[in-house]
Amino acid sequence: MEFLVDMVTTVPEGTSSETVEDTKRREAARTKELTAQGHLLRLWKPPEAPGEWRTFGLFNATDEDELRQVLASMPLHEWMTVTVTPFTPHPSDPGIGRPAG
């Protein structure tokens, strides 16, 4: 099942720049792992307001419980506000039956 995840990250006031950079490095590494595992399909950066740190992700998981576990494994998760929208295939989806890639 696919899910659109809106992730807004807010770094707690007083967090050192070293902690932020380390967490971002670990997040990038975890993103690669989730991609290799087939959980993370796409990422997008929408236009942001000043000071906003926002990402949209397309994730694949068996169900919402598994998705929540996947999201909790991301190093930035404790700083994120997450909104999840589950997707089901549309009968007119041009991608149905088309080979991936």
Show the residue positions of the predicted features:
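Conserved, structured core segments of small domains
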Residues: 1-101
